[in-house]
Amino acid sequence: MTLHRHFSAEASDGDRGRTLGAAQRERIALVTGVYGRLYALNGLGPADVAALGIQALDRIGAFAPELGTEIEGIAAGSGQPVETIAALNARTEILAASAGECSTIACLGSMTASGSALGIQTWDWHHELADGWMVWTIEHRDGRRVETMTEAGIVGKIGMNDRGVALLLNILGHRDDGPPIGVPVHVLCRAVLDRADGAVAALETIAAAEVSASSAITVVTDEDGGAVCTVEVSPAGPAFVTPDDSGVLVHTNHFLEQPGRAGDTGVREGPGTILRLDLAKRRMAAMRPGEVTPQAALASMASHRGGSSAMCCHPQPDDALGERWTTLATIVADPAVRELTVYRGGPCQIEAASTTAAAARQ
């Protein structure tokens, strides 16, 4: 299956959104259709989602007005109601109770063969969205560049900017998740990629955001041999997770620190997150300093243990909508060379495709 790309160099936020919406019209229709079915599974009808979309757009406009304008442009270009696209950008908040199975490994330069920090993650999500995501390269008129792997119609997710700030993303669950909608985590990720010029700026932006859906956002940069830190955001407030003494940080889908840990629901909903964390930590501990390469880290994630304990997920034929978890993509972030590499599928079936701006133009 082809890796979908889109390149943007429009001068205005609205034009950027309109052009993307028109170019990705069919893919956006696919994505909004799947989420419509997922909303319905959670008891939300079209009127409920529209109301939540309006609420989300107001929150986005207050936090990042330029991204609110971009979302309005995406809606216009794709022929979708603006509240539908706003709700799509807040789908984590609307479906806050849904499970997810993403695994992240990040290493400081002391552990890698290149001597530079490295971030790797699997993105596990609904199989029905296998053709609903893309790699989006954005060149702003002031020279800033952002590359993000995201679902069509959503302004950002996992990514890298030209200043060497990389973001990885894992869903979490907290008992206080829920309405009213806070800053949508996908909008937060894009804002960080747009704005941050280093690890401190990224961490400050993430920690300051008032969210209503919990996530672990891992920041990886190449500053002074690498900076790696996960911010666990939740309605209870932020917490920070740093690498262990060997220079490795592993995160899955449960809180590791307070204040979020006291209200964690991820372990109850998917206890396999504990096993994934343990397996990844043990496999990384078996590697010596200076030995970690992208290939070695990817190989460590090719685990197919059952249920939510698998780091490389494949759906079963009889799995129902909402339960067909699949590793849709595997991502390698190398901040030292400003490169985000996206592999379609899981670690056991990767097909590489560089997401450099030059590749995105092709």
Regions found by a protein language model. Give the residues of each.
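Internal mixed beta-strand/loop scaffold within catalytic domains of large alpha/beta enzymes
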Residues: 90-179, 183, 187-188, 328-331, ...
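C-terminus-biased signal that marks the final domain/tail of proteins
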Residues: 1-101, 194-228, 235-236, 243-362
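Short, well-ordered beta-strand elements within core beta-sheets of diverse protein domains
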Residues: 188-194
